[in-house]
């Protein structure tokens, strides 16, 4: 997998967390940099660990599915990307409640970690698909963690100003990127380019 594809995956994996961070930032009256950095660190660490867990699970099953690995990567990335696009198109009632609330909130470590795990399930599934590809999972984990740290830190700070405007679009963009990366993996394998 090319370095460019790894960076794309890193940013795609961070878009759910970015959308959640915008929501967290919107819930705060005036988010401080320490709040944003703490959220970025928690989300980034969790998002870096989950693809490694998925990769380990995928490696355990690799010998059984190696003939179909490119299809598995394509289907997993495509399904996750499609799910993210569909989720980005929906506006839930909690979005309106969050936007209407003027009550300042501070988010504790447990709340941030719970949200971080919830937004990193897709990264675990991507890790499973990466187990079937020629990629160094340590590099992917670091890239995903750094991208998530950056995106969440920015998301918290942008949250108050941008709220619902960018949040859903970021999730849709991340989904589109996953669908494209999955399609490129399948194309490279079928065409002999990979």
From Swiss-Prot:
Belongs to the MntP (TC 9.B.29) family. Probably functions as a manganese efflux pump. The chain crosses the membrane at residues 3-23, 37-57, 69-89, 110-132, 147-167, 172-192. Keywords: Cell inner membrane, Cell membrane, Ion transport, Manganese, Membrane, Transmembrane, Transmembrane helix, Transport. The lineage of its organism: Bacteria, Pseudomonadati, Pseudomonadota, Gammaproteobacteria, Lysobacterales. This is Putative manganese efflux pump MntP. It comes from the Bacteria. GO terms for cellular component: plasma membrane. InterPro entries: Mntp/YtaF, Put_MntP. It is found in: Cell inner membrane. Pfam families: Mntp. Its main location: membrane.
């Amino acid at each position: 997998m090319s370095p460019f594809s790894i960076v794309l995956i890193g940013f795609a994996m961070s878009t759910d967390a970015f959308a959640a961070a915008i929501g967290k930032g919107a819930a705060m009256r005036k988010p401080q940099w320490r709040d944003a950095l703490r959220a970025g660190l928690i989300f980034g660490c969790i998002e870096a660990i989950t693809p490694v867990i998925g990769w380990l699970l995928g490696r355990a099953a690799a010998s059984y599915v190696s003939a179909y690995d490119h299809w598995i990567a394509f289907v997993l990335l495509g399904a996750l990307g499609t799910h993210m696009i569909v989720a980005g198109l929906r506006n839930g009632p909690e979005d309106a409640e969050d936007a209407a609330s003027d009550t300042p909130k501070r988010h504790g470590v447990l709340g941030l970690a719970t949200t971080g795990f919830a937004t990193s399930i897709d990264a675990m599934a991507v890790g499973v698909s990466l187990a079937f590809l020629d990629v160094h999972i340590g590099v992917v984990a670091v890239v995903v963690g750094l991208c998530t740290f950056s995106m969440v830190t920015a998301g918290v700070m942008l949250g108050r100003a941008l709220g619902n405007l960018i949040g859903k679009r970021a999730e849709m963009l991340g989904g589109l990127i996953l669908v494209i990366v999955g399609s490129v993996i399948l194309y490279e394998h079928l065409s002999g380019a990979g």
